[in-house]
């Protein structure tokens, strides 16, 4: 019976999808073990290390449907690792004496690590697809809302004007950096593990590296320069990438949650009848995808910390740290795909309300562009004096609930240097966007 949201019948397609779950399933992992054993047999048979007939027979029986999972569970509980249980069944499935050549010169971790690498590669293909879709959809929003002026916020308060396109362009630029990181990461992760007991391949005498090369070619992996049984930087780096990627998605979801607040109401998740509704408050439209994203990404970040712990291993084969990866990797990959899936859903139907953004720009009576006035006065009064003057008038605007323009035009220190037309122009949010449009163009042109 499922106990985790990753495989719960109710929650599994919220926090992941069927494709990623299949990759990390018992059946697929075991098939990867069998793929490894078949590839090893082919490589060793081609080099004359085991008989050709044995290589062919081992390959013939390396199918997951031949595995008795009840027996495998029983042996794994007793041994502590599933690979030997698979090898025992494999040997018994082979005809004649072929079974005695199974797993020749290998060790459990060689099989497990290589299978994990192949699972990660397949997982990264899914992640890359979702990531590219998110970039495409976010770019559409950048272009559409390039000039949609809104309040930029600092410490949750209105700061200076930006455009929604600018906000989304920053998101696109970050996603593109993650795409670049993923492309750079894949060659470092896609490496075979095959070193035997302590990494030296001593059991294969002078043919160890030849077998290693052929095995890597058979599995579509890179040959390692040296064994990495207790050097876990590859796995940790993969985990850190997932943590960074999902951290970016959580930042995006957090912004959407805040923009959905009743008092703000500038952006909303896609509408679907009853989605995000409350059991007691009929008016509610909760940011449900954003909630799933922020919850899942928190879990992923904790998993990354565990993967970093797993780097601290003893000697050439470790006592316990390695098993952390077994626990963590399936769920962090599933939850990463889940967050990407929810992000794509958001981007496909995100509701943007320019009129509400424009309304919110005016709620401070012009204070959102007070910096523009200060900078216009600074060359005349000096920056500090200009700051103090505008600060005083902003405070007065708040106290008396008066438009800033009215107070500025009543202040001699302002009118001595700025005309009414200049003050009015300075207080137009659309005139204080700086290099917004140039930066948007640069963000979109990044290859």
From Swiss-Prot:
GO terms for cellular component: cytosol; nucleus
Listed GO MF terms: carbon-nitrogen lyase activity
Annotated keywords: Cytoplasm, Nucleus
Keyword Cytoplasm: yes
CDD domains found in the cross-reference section: pCLME
Coarse class of the protein's main subcellular location: cytoplasm
Record-linked SUPFAM superfamilies: L-aspartase-like
UniProt entry tagged with the keyword Nucleus: yes
Localization per Swiss-Prot or TrEMBL: Cytoplasm; Nucleus
Family: Belongs to the class-II fumarase/aspartase family.
The protein's name in its UniProt record: Uncharacterized protein C8E4.05c
């Amino acid at each position: 019976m499922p106990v985790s949201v990753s495989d719960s019948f109710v929650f599994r397609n919220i926090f992941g999808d069927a494709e990623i779950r299949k990759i990390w399933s018992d059946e697929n992992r075991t098939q990867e073990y069998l793929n490894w054993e078949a590839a090893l047999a082919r490589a060793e048979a081609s080099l004359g290390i085991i008989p050709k007939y044995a290589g062919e027979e081992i390959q013939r029986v390396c199918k997951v449907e031949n595995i008795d999972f009840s027996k495998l569970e029983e042996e794994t509980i007793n041994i502590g690792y599933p690979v030997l249980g698979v090898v025992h069944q494999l040997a018994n499935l082979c005809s004649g004496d072929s079974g005695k050549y199974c797993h020749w010169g290998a060790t459990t971790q060689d099989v497990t690590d290589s299978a994990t690498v192949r699972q990660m590669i397949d997982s990264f293909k899914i992640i890359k697809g979702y990531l590219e879709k998110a970039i495409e959809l976010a770019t559409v929003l950048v272009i559409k809302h390039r000039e949609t002026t809104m309040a930029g916020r600092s410490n949750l308060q209105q700061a200076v004007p930006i455009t929604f396109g600018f906000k989304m362009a920053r998101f696109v630029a970050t996603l593109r950096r993650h795409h670049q990181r993923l492309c750079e990461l894949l060659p470092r992760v896609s490496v075979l593990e095959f070193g035997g007991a302590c990494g030296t391949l001593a059991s294969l005498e002078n043919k160890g590296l030849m077998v290693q090369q052929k095995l890597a070619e058979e599995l579509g992996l890179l040959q390692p320069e040296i064994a990495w049984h207790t050097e876990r930087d590859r796995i940790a780096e993969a985990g850190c990438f997932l943590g960074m990627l999902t951290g970016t998605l959580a930042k995006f979801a957090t912004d959407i949650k805040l923009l959905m607040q009743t008092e703000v109401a500038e952006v909303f998740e896609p509408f679907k009848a009853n989605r995000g509704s409350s059991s007691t408050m009929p008016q509610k439209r909760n940011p449900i995808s954003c909630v799933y994203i922020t919850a899942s990404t928190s879990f992923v970040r904790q998993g990354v910390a565990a993967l970093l712990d797993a780097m601290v291993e003893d000697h050439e084969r470790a006592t316990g740290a390695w098993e952390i990866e077994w626990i963590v990797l399936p769920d962090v990959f599933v939850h990463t795909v889940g967050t990407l899936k929810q992000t794509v859903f958001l981007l496909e139907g995100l509701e943007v309300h320019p009129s509400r953004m424009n309304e919110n720009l005016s709620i401070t009576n012009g204070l959102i562009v007070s910096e523009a006035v200060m900078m216009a006065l600074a060359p005349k009064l000096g920056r500090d004096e200009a700051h103090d003057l505008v600060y005083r008038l902003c405070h007065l605007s708040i106290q008396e609930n008066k438009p800033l323009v009215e107070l500025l035009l009543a202040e001699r220190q302002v009118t001595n240097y700025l005309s009414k037309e200049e003050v009015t122009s300075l207080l137009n949010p659309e005139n204080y966007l700086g290099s917004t449009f140039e930066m948007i163009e640069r963000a979109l042109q990044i290859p």
